[in-house]
């Protein structure tokens, strides 16, 4: 990646958009300190970051309830879990088996899992992947609601401009590992 420069402030949604293979996920992983930059500097004013990856590998044959899934790799309590599920509109799924969830329900659970500890930066990598048209609209509305309610910055990674434009404050375009300047949307 070359030429990347953008900020994600509290209460702001910034979208990194570009075709497959243009380095969007790599950029996100550098911001999250999952990957190191070969050169240059990645800075963050917070360690309270959460990430919803583009793909998550789950053994769908394993009996796993939503409440148990929420606790994997994170020390959150039941109150945090129910509040996060309520924020994402799926509190009724608390004791449901994960393998029985629809694509949209599972995405909402993933987002709830990420926001349970109230991050200051939320990174969402292709959050509407595998969700139907109506579900996409609902998820983009949910993302805006989360930004407003938690006053957290959101970095939204996408390759689809359709609904992104209605919820984002800034758009940064990534193309063949070069990033164009951020576009401010008013």
Please give the residue ranges for each predicted region:
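The feature captures the beta-strand-to-loop junction immediately N-terminal to the Walker
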Residues: 17-19
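Conserved catalytic motifs of ABC-family nucleotide-binding domains
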Residues: 118
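Conserved ABC ATPase "signature" region
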Residues: 78-95
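Conserved ABC ATPase signature
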Residues: 97-101, 105
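Catalytic Walker B motif of ABC-type/P-loop ATPase nucleotide-binding domains
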Residues: 122-126
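Conserved small/polar residues in nucleotide/adenosyl-binding loops
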Residues: 176-182
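H-loop/switch region of ABC-family ATPase nucleotide-binding domains
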Residues: 158-159
């Amino acid at each position: 990646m070359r030429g990347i420069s953008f900020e994600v402030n509290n209460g702001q949604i910034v979208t990194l958009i570009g075709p497959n293979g243009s380095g969007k996920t790599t950029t996100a992983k550098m911001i999250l300190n999952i990957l190191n930059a070969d050169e240059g500097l990645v800075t963050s004013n917070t360690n309270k970051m959460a990430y919803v990856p583009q793909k998550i590998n789950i053994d769908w044959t394993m009996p796993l309830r939503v409440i148990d899934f929420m606790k994997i790799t994170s020390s959150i309590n039941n109150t945090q879990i129910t509040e996060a599920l309520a924020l994402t509109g799926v509190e009724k799924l608390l004791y449901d088996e994960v393998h029985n969830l629809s694509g949209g329900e599972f995405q909402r659970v993933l987002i709830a899992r990420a926001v349970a500890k109230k991050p200051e930066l939320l990174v969402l990598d292709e959050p509407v992947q595998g969700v139907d048209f109506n579900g996409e609209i609902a998820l983009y509305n949910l993302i805006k609601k989360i930004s407003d309610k938690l006053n957290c910055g959101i970095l939204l990674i996408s390759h689809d401009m359709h609904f992104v434009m209605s919820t984002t404050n800034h758009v940064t375009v990534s193309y063949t590992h070069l990033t164009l300047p951020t576009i401010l949307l008013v």
